[in-house]
Amino acid sequence: MSTETNNNLCIGCNKPFKSTDNIKTSNFKKYHEQCFSQDLNCSKCSGPIIASAEHKQVLGKIYHSKCFTCASCSKVLSDNDFSEISGIPCCKSCFTEIKFNPNFAISKFGSASAITQNDEKTKEKFEMKTNLYNNLQKGKDICTWCRNQIQADPDNEAVSFGGNIYHSNCFTCSKCSSSIGKNQFVTGSDGSAICKSCSDKSKQVNCFACKKPIDSTFTVVSGNKYHPNCFVCSQCKGSLEKGYIEKDGPVCGKCAATFTQPQTRTFAYSNGKGARPNGRW
């Protein structure tokens, strides 16, 4: 069955023309003079805009007054109380939330996969919010760690590392989690950033006895390193300058004489370049 347009009805108000009416024509459509508005359509609902209906022209587009709403929360907007992101209208409240909370558009609706294909209205809303966020962030750097926008801030400058960008206070040591910021650091074997303090500790040699760093000469015994003053008899804590034997640790000759089994006497003093040749008791 085919339908024909009634040429005696105004497209704007759907009322019949009178013989006394001035008729306007556009795109083969007829309007009462008071209903004619250059055959414009609403940018949101695509419905015709007629002169007798409330409408407004903003951001280079024309809307029914009731259709000029925030793309984020659907609040009806007034002429002087709205913001825009890349030509998309939104209320000032949503604009602020989107601008200063980069995860707002996504966190409010969840991931795209969580939106059912049947719920087209919800899906459309989600896409609109995501587009608002993406348009706002175009050309702006996002911190790899906190996912917030990196603003021009002399107290929190950006740091680039490994192809990523961070707020300086978000750029931290992979070992101790302290902030590296703009300070010196080294790159670990796994490609992570390590602060200078942790790097120095990893290279540091500690005394086996006192656990403190060794920064000069040392003695090597059974693969362990000692400060010269820390290498003492494990029994009496006396000097081992004349040699030692291994008995649950280095033992001096006097203490060794108390043992029933003969032991091997060993000399192993070093200036840090290696042990001396071993001798026999």
Curated annotation (Swiss-Prot):
Gene3D superfamilies given in the database record: Cysteine Rich Protein
Residues of the LIM zinc-binding domain: 40-101, 141-205, 206-262
Keyword hit for Acetylation: no
Keyword Metal-binding: yes
Gene Ontology CC entries for this record: nucleus
Gene Ontology MF: a single term: metal ion binding
Entry keyword set: LIM domain, Metal-binding, Repeat, Zinc
PANTHER family according to UniProt: FOUR AND A HALF LIM DOMAINS PROTEIN, GH01042P-RELATED
Name of protein: LIM domain-containing protein G
Organism per entry: Dictyostelium discoideum
Lineage: Eukaryota, Amoebozoa, Evosea, Eumycetozoa, Dictyostelia
